[in-house]
Amino acid sequence: GLKAGTPVVAGAGDKAAGATGMGIVTPGAVSATIGTSGVVFAATDRPALDAQGRLHTFCHALPGRWHVMGVTQAAGLSLRWFRDRFGAGAEDGRDPYERLTSDAARVPPGADGLLWAPYLMGERTPHLDPNARGALIGLTASHTRDHIIRSILEGVAFSLRDSFTLFEEMGVPVKSIRLGGGGARSALWRQIQADVYGHEVEIVEVEEGAAYGAAILAGVGAKMWNSVDAACSAAVRVAQRVAPRPAVVRQMNASYAAYRRMYPAVRSICSKMEP
């Protein structure tokens, strides 16, 4: 067994640990991470409950704190789906996702009117609907492969923005937004998120937030710091900030309004096709 006196420290669930590793521990601090799924996670000092089940509320990794989060089922999965079905372009030694986002960067914000609904696996936020379906709307003969890729990047960001819309509805404050996951490695996707959210976004130095968060919690338990707040202030550092572009924010607001009309329209069509 363990030697007598060895500290044993409780950790946290994956999202709470990841948020701790990004410094998302005080009210107003929010993270938006894009992996296979996408998660918008807000730290709170009270349980913020959504009676409709569109957001999920849990205890945080530190006493007296909670977190509320929204989930996009197919965030990074949308881009992976495109890669797997249609390819990532000619091999040139770069990562396939770098090639895809580089292609998308050739297209202006708004993808010339093309919209993507990323509901490839049903959805959780804001539509708690296992039968939600994905859609590409606005396609014309002038659109290219690059337009489709950009519309996917923007559509995922619109889906994550839905969580921020619900936070506002519920009175959950948003003072800072930190990006994480594989999506945060793309300069284009970082800028798209800043423009879609209409808010400066930050990138922290350490990418592996969950492991880093578990290490921070262990350090607090071992008395390296006297609190998780103090530990995050000392150990979590911002590497980059990305500002939204006002003209693009206005354009993204208009696109988001159109995006919000997609789900009910597609749901109405698809419900009539179900056996």
Residue ranges of predicted features:
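Glycine/Thr-rich phosphate-binding loops that ligate phosphate moieties of nucleotide
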Residues: 42-275
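Conserved active-site beta-strand element of glycosyltransferases/polysaccharide synthases
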Residues: 32
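Conserved phosphate-binding catalytic cores of ATP/NTP-utilizing and phosphoryl-transfer enzymes
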Residues: 1-2, 12-29
